[in-house]
């Protein structure tokens, strides 16, 4: 079997396992909900108020955590993804000694800017935020949304899909493919559109460093801010009352600042457009 076939089979396998993970979590939660240790408020699925769902929030939150952790272990066991946090490559980004803080800040600014620019479109989130808000009321849910879930996504889309395909379809092609899949699994335009562009930013950094510290840290910071917004109304509704020109203008400025911060080290176009070495 040729190398290209093996790599694309691994890519398809990782992505399918990720999708299977999403189906497995509620099944595990349903099984745990009958145990006294996981008694609690019933997990409310918006739109299903007239149906009976015997899944409790503690069970759903714990299932998210355990199943995602098992997924990380499975990737490590199969060797399909290299779980490497230290590559030894430069991650300076123009701020000697502070690359992680720099990129985390850049990523959060970029993320907030995209959200502001999309506010005038009034996109539907498919009740995803309502579901995640319930999970964020439990410590296992917070750990899943902020820590383990972000690691799963970085391993799947950056260390997995991007790294496996870049040798065959080039850096740009791999960035687009991994970001598109990353966007699609979010399941709604409210999250998918910013996820695509943020996926490009994360893939770009992984291309430069092959070091998950920066990608994972930035992803953690972004999700932590989202969880905070669930419980702090001024942050959750930031910019909603602004006129459209201000939403788009401030958002575009933040996106420009984030983009400049991402590229400030200098031109990487030569490497970016070059095909990765085999």
Predicted regions, residues:
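Juxtamembrane helix-loop-helix connectors linking adjacent transmembrane helices
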Residues: 31, 38-55, 80-155, 163, ...
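Alpha-helical transmembrane segments in multi-pass membrane proteins
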Residues: 15-79
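Membrane-interface segments at the starts/ends of alpha-helical transmembrane spans
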Residues: 8, 41-59, 235-249
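Small-polar-interrupted transmembrane alpha-helices in polytopic inner-membrane proteins
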Residues: 171-186, 220
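Hydrophobic core of alpha-helical transmembrane segments in multi-pass integral membrane proteins
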Residues: 18-27, 63-73, 104-116, 247-270
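Functionally important transmembrane alpha-helices
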Residues: 23, 27-31, 191-248
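Hydrophobic alpha-helical transmembrane segments
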Residues: 12-16, 58, 97-105, 139, ...
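Membrane-interface helix/loop boundary segments of multi-pass membrane proteins
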Residues: 152-177, 204-211
């Amino acid at each position: 079997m040729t190398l290209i076939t093996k790599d694309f089979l691994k890519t398809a396998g990782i992505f399918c396992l990720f999708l299977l993970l999403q189906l497995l979590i509620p099944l595990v939660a349903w099984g745990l909900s009958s145990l006294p240790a996981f008694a609690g408020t019933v997990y409310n699925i918006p739109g299903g108020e007239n149906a009976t769902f015997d899944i409790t929030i503690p069970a759903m939150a714990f299932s998210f955590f355990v199943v995602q952790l098992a997924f990380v272990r499975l990737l490590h066991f199969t060797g399909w993804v290299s779980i490497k946090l230290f590559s030894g490559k430069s991650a300076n980004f123009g701020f000697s000694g502070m690359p992680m803080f720099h990129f985390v800040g850049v990523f959060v600014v970029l993320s907030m800017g995209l959200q502001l620019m999309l506010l005038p479109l009034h996109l539907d989130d498919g009740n995803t935020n309502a579901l995640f808000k319930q999970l964020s009321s439990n410590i296992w849910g917070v750990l899943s949304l902020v820590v383990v879930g972000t690691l799963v996504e970085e391993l799947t889309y950056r260390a997995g899909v991007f790294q496996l395909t870049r040798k065959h379809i080039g850096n740009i092609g791999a960035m687009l493919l991994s970001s598109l899949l990353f966007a699609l699994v979010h399941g709604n335009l409210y999250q998918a559109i910013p996820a695509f562009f943020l996926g490009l930013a994360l893939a770009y950094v992984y291309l430069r460093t092959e070091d998950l510290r920066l990608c994972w840290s930035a992803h953690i910071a972004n999700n932590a801010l989202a969880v905070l917004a669930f419980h702090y109304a001024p942050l959750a509704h930031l910019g909603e009352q602004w006129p459209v020109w201000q939403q788009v203008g401030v958002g575009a400025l933040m996106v420009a600042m984030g983009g400049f911060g991402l590229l400030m080290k200098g031109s990487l176009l030569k490497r970016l457009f070059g095909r990765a070495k085999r």
